[in-house]
């Protein structure tokens, strides 16, 4: 995955070409096509063992997987206790009426123990995981525009997104095993792939770098780490609404809209795919040119800055997109 112009996700224009949008409002919205596919069961992965031993699972990995399944995402699961995991713990604690310290105490461990299911599961790599194509994604935007699709660059990257994990973690869990060979049985995080309830409100907290989904009573039932704004392109604080949802969006790059663009850049139409600058989903907001979207580099979420938009991992953006619709209130706050 290429990191160049990751911030080129806001002050943008997206062409709406796909017929199916998550909206009733006929007003045009940024375009999609192919939703991100979570680790849906297949004949191969439902055969023999579908769970893996949890006996040797690292404590931090265990916590990250349980938080993911509880809908308080730590972002990319990597087995490391970092800021995203601590924010997820704090959100989980608030949901359960516990002091939101972001630290693992006895009460938090007990609440996490109530999250059902094994930590790891066994997945059999299928042909679709490894057949590609796996293009080398160029850094230059015009060169990107010359590709048919900005797909995954490797089977490891594709499997990482499927299981909300870093490719390095998958390699660590499966020493000596080929991630790019159909038929390989892998230990993978047993992550959440179900849909969330419909959200009555989206809340983005700039200071805490999280996006939250709340019910009609204002109770937060899901939380995701996010990247929001910068000194040059601040998050547009205020109350907005969702215009609509577009999957697999085409990104219309206009260098005039970016303070850090290369002076030699020209306008370009960037094809869809998980390595598109806005990832697999664009949730259009009533604030012109702004939206909630995915990313080609999940490891950077919550740790970098954007051009004003709200950036999530692709799998988080997909979950949020399925939980909102036209008119859903969005509060962007300090």
Predicted features along the sequence, with ranges:
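Sec-exported extracytoplasmic/periplasmic mature domains
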Residues: 65-72, 90-98, 109, 113-117, ...
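Exported/periplasmic cell-wall-interacting domains
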Residues: 263-334
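A short amphipathic alpha-helical interaction element
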Residues: 54-101
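Gly/Pro-biased beta-strand-loop elements
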Residues: 196-295
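Compositionally biased, proline/threonine/alanine/serine-rich low-complexity intrinsically disordered stretches
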Residues: 22-63, 117, 121
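Extracellular LysM carbohydrate-binding repeats and other cell-envelope/extracellular binding modules
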Residues: 83-87, 91-129, 171-201
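Secretory/export targeting leaders with adjacent low-complexity proregions
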Residues: 148-223
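Bacterial N-terminal signal peptides
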Residues: 7-17
